[in-house]
């Protein structure tokens, strides 16, 4: 399924009153949900994070101390224009394992410059800058899975 077609479907869901849309073409399928159901996922993840922190606290006191300290700077760090993932997939900073990264922190980018790649269903989708500016932060590590609408890059 073409990325342009997926973007059109996302716009259709945003503009209409429907809460979820699922389309299948052959072996490929896409499910798009409105923001209300997606917002419930982080709440559930936070609910699961608390018990996970309590269990290591009994066996190892250092582990819970590092988790909150990593979350606090990330929340404070996100200011400026945020480029978000248009799909669920795997984030890559480089076009190939040996190649130089598309962007680095501090680099100036223009509208249309490739920032990264999100691989979805064996298709490499280039994520382009929708604003000119300077890369302030890259929020995801290369090879890490990303969710729909997850912040990837901050441009100032």
Curated annotation (Swiss-Prot):
A GO cellular component annotation in the UniProt record: acetyl-CoA carboxylase complex
Keywords from the UniProt entry: Biotin, Fatty acid biosynthesis, Fatty acid metabolism, Lipid biosynthesis, Lipid metabolism
InterPro entries membership: AcCoA_biotinCC (IPR001249), Biotin_BS (IPR001882), Biotin_Carboxyl_Carrier/Decarb (IPR050709), Biotin_lipoyl (IPR000089), Single_hybrid_motif (IPR011053)
Pfam families in the cross-refs: Biotin_lipoyl
Gene3D superfamilies: 2.40.50.100
Pathway this chain belongs to: Lipid metabolism; fatty acid biosynthesis
GO molecular function, one term: molecular adaptor activity
Domain of life, source organism: Bacteria
GO aspect biological process, one term: malonyl-CoA biosynthetic process
Domain Biotinyl-binding: residue ranges: 73-156
Modified residues (N6-biotinyllysine): 122
Keyword Transcription regulation: no
Task of the protein: This protein is a component of the acetyl coenzyme A carboxylase complex; first, biotin carboxylase catalyzes the carboxylation of the carrier protein and then the transcarboxylase transfers the carboxyl group to form malonyl-CoA.
Record text on subunit structure and interactions: Homodimer.
Protein name per Swiss-Prot or TrEMBL: Biotin carboxyl carrier protein of acetyl-CoA carboxylase
Gene field: accB
